[in-house]
């Protein structure tokens, strides 16, 4: 009997371990299911409007904003047949390229910077400012500089994405300047537009993209991670961001990063992705043709997000 005792003990240990792993696995599934549900939401009209100077110039609709970095430096407005014409004054080139923009109710445009293939002495300095295109005059200028943002040779990125909060006239802005391949030191800033006061800083997450979403369950800041292929959400309560985000969705391709988030319809999001590794190649020139778009929709009966199509 003693001869078989070690075998019995081994089998007992294996059985207990399997039971523990089973319980851990199922507890994770249940937790993930709860976290993934943002509540029912719809696409809503934005409070932002197009700049008034475009009306003064009698630019016809439709008008598209071009930040592609392929033909124009800075920002350009495209219009006419097949968007073949443009509004792009030389003065709009002075701050190099931009990564994202948002419009406010007056038609002012706020933009975050973007380093390009060729690094110049002025490039790193550009990455710590938010820029404003005046709705009436069309003048492009530095709106606010955050001096603690310090892009450099190891990581040329600084302020990278933003969204406008129609509820309280504020901006949510992300920066990834102090991060590297191993450590996440990103910051999300909440800024009052009227006073330029930083209302809140949340450290420790590299948000490559940000998007506000309001649902029947609450208000969230959706963020696409620069470090992995997942979409996350911060809770917003009393105009304050929660200390840490919760995971919402994971892409099937591990090298893709969510660069842009759009609300397309009922419980429907569109995610634009790029490869990203804290180097310039992911955002420039030839890499434009490997961007992907995914439409994901929350299926309440299956309690999960589903990819509707990819192209």
Task: List the predicted regions and their residue ranges.
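Short coil/turn segments that connect the beta-strands within blades of beta-propeller domains
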Residues: 106-108, 167-169, 217-220, 266-268
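Beta-propeller blade signature
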Residues: 76-77, 125-138, 185-194, 285-302
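Short, solvent-exposed loop/turn segments at conserved positions within beta-propeller repeat blades
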Residues: 69-72, 120-127, 179-185, 226-227, ...
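Beta-strand-rich domains and repeat architectures in extracellular enzymes and scaffolds
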Residues: 38-76, 92-107
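Beta-propeller domains
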Residues: 60-92, 118-127, 132-134
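Surface-exposed loop and turn segments in beta-propeller and other repeat-based domains
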Residues: 78-94, 137-157, 202-208, 244-257, ...
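Repeated scaffold domains used in trafficking and secretory/extracellular systems
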Residues: 44-55, 95-102, 154-162, 204-214, ...
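Short loop/turn segments immediately following the C-termini of beta-strands
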Residues: 67-70, 114-116, 176-178, 183, ...
């Amino acid at each position: 009997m003693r001869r078989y005792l070690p075998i019995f003990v081994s089998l007992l240990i294996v059985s207990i371990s399997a039971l523990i792993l089973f319980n851990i696995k199922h507890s994770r599934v249940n937790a993930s299911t709860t976290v993934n549900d943002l509540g029912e939401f719809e696409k809503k009209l934005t409070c932002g409007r197009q700049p008034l100077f475009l009306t003064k110039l009698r630019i016809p609709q439709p008008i598209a904003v071009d930040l592609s970095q392929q033909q124009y430096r800075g920002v350009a407005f495209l219009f006419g047949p097949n968007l073949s014409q443009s509004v792009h004054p030389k003065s709009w080139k002075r701050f190099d390229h931009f990564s994202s923009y948002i419009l406010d109710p007056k038609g002012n445009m706020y933009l975050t910077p973007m380093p390009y293939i060729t690094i110049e002495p002025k490039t790193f300095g550009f990455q710590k400012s938010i820029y404003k295109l005046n709705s009436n005059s069309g003048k492009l200028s530095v709106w606010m500089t955050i001096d603690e943002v310090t892009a450099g040779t190891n990581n040329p990125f600084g302020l990278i994405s933003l969204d406008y909060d129609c509820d309280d006239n504020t901006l949510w802005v992300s920066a990834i300047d102090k991060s590297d391949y191993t450590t996440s030191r990103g910051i999300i800033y909440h800024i009052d537009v009227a006073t330029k006061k930083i209302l809140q800083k949340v450290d420790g997450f590299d948000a490559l993209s940000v998007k506000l979403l309001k649902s029947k369950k609450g208000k969230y800041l959706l963020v696409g991670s620069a470090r992995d292929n997942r979409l996350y959400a911060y809770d917003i309560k009393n105009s304050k961001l929660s200390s840490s985000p919760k995971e919402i969705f994971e892409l099937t391709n591990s090298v893709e990063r969510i660069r842009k988030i759009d609300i397309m319809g009922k419980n429907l999001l569109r995610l634009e992705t790029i490869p990203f590794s804290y180097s310039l190649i992911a955002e420039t020139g030839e890499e434009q043709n490997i961007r992907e778009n995914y439409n994901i929709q929350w299926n309440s009966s299956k309690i999960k997000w589903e990819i509707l199509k990819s192209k």
